[in-house]
From Swiss-Prot:
Swiss-Prot/TrEMBL GO biological process terms: translation
Alphabetized PANTHER family for the sequence: LARGE RIBOSOMAL SUBUNIT PROTEIN BL19M, RIBOSOMAL PROTEIN L19
Family that this chain belongs to: Belongs to the bacterial ribosomal protein bL19 family.
Name recorded for this polypeptide: Large ribosomal subunit protein bL19
Keyword Magnesium applies: no
PROSITE patterns listed in its UniProt record: RIBOSOMAL_L19
Gene, per the UniProt record: rplS
Species assigned in the record: Streptomyces avermitilis (strain ATCC 31267 / DSM 46492 / JCM 5070 / NBRC 14893 / NCIMB 12804 / NRRL 8165 / MA-4680)
Gene Ontology CC, one term: cytosolic large ribosomal subunit
GO molecular function, one term: structural constituent of ribosome
Keywords carried by this UniProt record: Ribonucleoprotein, Ribosomal protein
Length: 116
């Protein structure tokens, strides 16, 4: 039974996504369906967590819009996410960046990772 579930899961996995981690700034292109129309909406922010594995893997992106913090959680392997663009790589020491919720302004800024 487990082998059957693994084969169904592996068929649903996407391979066209970039390797991103918490701390990275990403631009997520999301398909939004309004009535009978659909359009692509961009959500740009910092990845504050990546959780789960396989088909059930999700990631949460946080941005500040009009001085209000907005967090949105996306499944990694969903067809609703058109594409994920990696804007910058962040240099952080934690896997879950929940402490960014309390920080404001310059304190909430993440150092950019230097490629060497």
């Amino acid at each position: 039974m487990s082998h059957l579930l693994d084969s169904v899961d592996s068929a649903s996995l996407r391979s066209d996504l970039p390797a991103f981690r918490p701390g990275d700034t990403v631009n997520v292109h999301v398909r939004v369906i309004e009535g009978n129309r659909s359009r692509v909406q961009q959500f740009k922010g910092v990845v504050i967590r990546r959780q789960g594995a396989g088909v059930r893997e999700t990631f949460t992106v946080r941005k500040v819009s009009f001085s209000v913090g907005v967090e949105r959680t996306f499944p990694v392997h969903t067809p609703i996410v058109e594409k994920i663009e990696l804007v910058t790589r962040g240099d952080v020491r934690r896997a879950k960046l929940y402490y960014l919720r309390e920080l404001r302004g310059k304190a909430a800024k993440i150092k950019e990772k230097r490629e060497s």
